[in-house]
């Protein structure tokens, strides 16, 4: 037979698992205090004397050992723990000694809270921030036409514009630099390239003035950049063909067995080379040697203009080829 159950069952006890409430209760019942911002020279005996009005049972100053190659030394952590007879004495010490001055430092005194993994505070999630591109406002004309556009097409256009803008900006920056109508830039020339080699390479386009110089390019990240020097030249031509066409044709040919780069020269590069030549006196020396060019120097026997790397009659007047600079211009790009 079944027994009749009582209509008044005993109350069920429900435990409160709130970590914050438990830690607060533990702190109220603890007999230990935690002291921070302590002077590193403080000793346990000095703290016992400082806390004597509250009858501490023990004082602990934690430290750690710093191990060196030849010796070890103990370094305090700047904190201390003190135990008292009752929780009331501990709370009394906290209320009286917090923010008091001890050895020219304001002590931070509070009740000790035992460590528990549940009491560890989790870091708050960082707010998500939109990129500058997504925060940027749409132009007024796009806002006016937003209602009539397909949302899928609009999103595709925005993604395409975001990916193409950096490249287009770089190309526009390059196109903005003006180029010469009669001068080409030859890069990555062989180290021993001479004036005669370049005149032979561009013989179909009547080369006039030639500047051979060294330039420098940096590769790699900023903190590990490797600087590579290479030979380049500026060549002024007298031809009905456009400079772009000449650069396209001559880029397919090799000089001394090496493929080179030929493109229209930037006017700023031409001005830079000539300015350095004027500063170093190269243009004046070439002007002085204008009539000292042999008929077989590669320019049809005509006197060389300023900066033409012809063959002087006096070998001692020729530029130093060890620097790969003819006629003596050294440019660092």
From Swiss-Prot:
Gene3D superfamilies recorded? 3.30.70.330
Task: Give the top-rank taxon of the lineage listed in the UniProt record for this protein.
Answer: Eukaryota
**Family designation:** Belongs to the RRT5 family.
Domain RRM as annotated: residue spans: 31-114, 182-267
Checking SMART domains in the record gives: RRM
Gly residues biased stretches: 298-308
Keywords per UniProt: Repeat, RNA-binding, Transcription, Transcription regulation
> Where does the record place Basic residues bias?
125-137
Could you tell me what this protein is called? Answer: Regulator of rDNA transcription protein 5
